[in-house]
C-alpha cells in the first residue's frame, strides 16, 4: 500500500519549495566572505544572489532530509543526492532508508517508488505553476520582486557566527510562509534549511559535498518507467 500522505503529497507538494530553495542556494554558496561581526547589508546579499544565479549552470550535493507529517505526527529521516541544472531540471535521488526518485524536467515530473513498483507522473507546469518560480527557473526572475529577504530576528547569526536568513514569498497563495537558512560564515555554503508548508508539515535539510558547474548531462533528468510498474497520472 502506498503511503500517499508522505510519499505522494509530501514530495509533489513540497517540490515547489525545494525548487525555490535550490535557486536561492546557487547564489549563497558563492557570496564573498565577510567577518562574523560585520555581516553585509541585506541588499548586497540579494544583489549577489541574483548575479550568481544567472551564471550558475548546475549543482549537486548530498543531503539529509527530516520530514514531519503533521496529520500522522511522524518524522522520517532520509538521505540522498540532489542535482539541479538550468533551466527547470531537478533530481532528488533518495538512497536511505529506501530508494526513490523525484525527477523533473521542462515537460514532466515523475515520482518513482521502486519498492512499490509505482510511478506517479504529472505535467511539470503543474508543479511549477508559480509565475515567479517559472521566471526563476528560466533565469529571468528577480529576487527583490519575488521575495522579501532579511536576517532572522532577534539574531542574524548563530553561536558559531553563521548567518541566519529568512526569505518571505511576495506571491499570494504560496505553499510556505518563509524559508529559514543557516549559511556558513567561512565559505557561505548552506548548512541547513527549514520550512513549513501550508498543511503544517515541516522539512529540515542538511547539505554536504557541494559541487558547482560540474557539467551535468541533461540525460540525468530524463526518466523511462521500468517494465512492470504501475503508473498513475496526477491531476
PLM region spans:
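Extracytoplasmic
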Residues: 56-58, 77-79, 87, 97, ...
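An acidic-aromatic
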Residues: 81-131, 203-204
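N-terminal secretory signal peptides that target proteins for export/translocation
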Residues: 1-13
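N-terminal leader/targeting segments and the immediate start of mature chains
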Residues: 2, 29-74, 225-235
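Short beta-strands and strand-coil junctions in structured, solvent-facing domains, enriched
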Residues: 69-71, 98-101, 111, 118-119, ...
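Bacterial N-terminal signal peptides
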Residues: 16-29
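Gly/Pro-enriched, hydrophobic low-complexity segments
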Residues: 145-235
Amino acid at each position: 500500500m502506498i503511503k500517499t500522505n508522505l510519499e505522494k503529497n509530501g514530495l509533489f507538494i513540497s517540490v515547489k519549495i525545494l525548487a525555490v530553495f535550490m535557486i536561492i542556494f546557487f547564489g549563497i554558496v558563492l557570496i564573498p566572505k565577510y567577518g562574523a561581526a560585520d555581516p553585509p547589508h541585506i541588499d548586497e546579499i540579494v544583489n549577489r544572489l541574483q548575479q550568481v544565479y544567472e551564471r550558475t549552470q548546475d549543482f549537486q550535493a548530498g543531503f539529509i532530509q527530516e520530514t514531519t507529517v503533521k496529520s500522522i505526527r511522524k518524522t522520517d529521516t532520509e538521505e540522498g543526492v540532489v542535482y539541479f541544472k538550468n533551466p527547470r531540471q531537478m533530481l532528488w535521488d533518495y538512497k536511505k532508508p529506501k530508494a526513490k526518485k523525484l525527477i523533473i524536467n521542462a515537460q514532466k515530473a515523475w515520482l518513482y517508488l521502486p519498492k512499490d513498483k509505482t510511478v506517479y507522473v504529472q505535467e511539470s507546469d503543474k508543479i511549477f505553476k508559480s509565475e515567479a518560480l517559472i521566471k526563476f527557473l528560466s533565469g529571468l526572475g528577480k529576487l527583490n520582486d519575488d521575495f522579501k529577504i532579511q536576517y532572522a530576528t532577534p539574531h542574524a547569526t548563530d553561536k558559531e557566527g553563521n548567518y541566519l536568513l529568512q526569505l518571505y514569498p511576495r506571491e499570494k497563495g504560496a505553499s510556505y510562509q518563509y524559508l529559514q537558512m543557516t549559511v556558513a560564515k567561512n565559505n557561505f555554503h548552506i548548512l541547513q534549511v527549514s520550512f513549513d508548508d501550508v498543511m503544517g508539515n515541516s522539512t529540515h535539510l542538511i547539505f554536504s559535498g557541494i559541487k558547482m558547474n560540474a557539467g551535468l548531462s541533461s540525460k540525468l533528468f530524463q526518466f523511462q518507467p521500468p517494465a512492470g510498474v504501475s503508473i498513475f497520472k496526477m491531476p
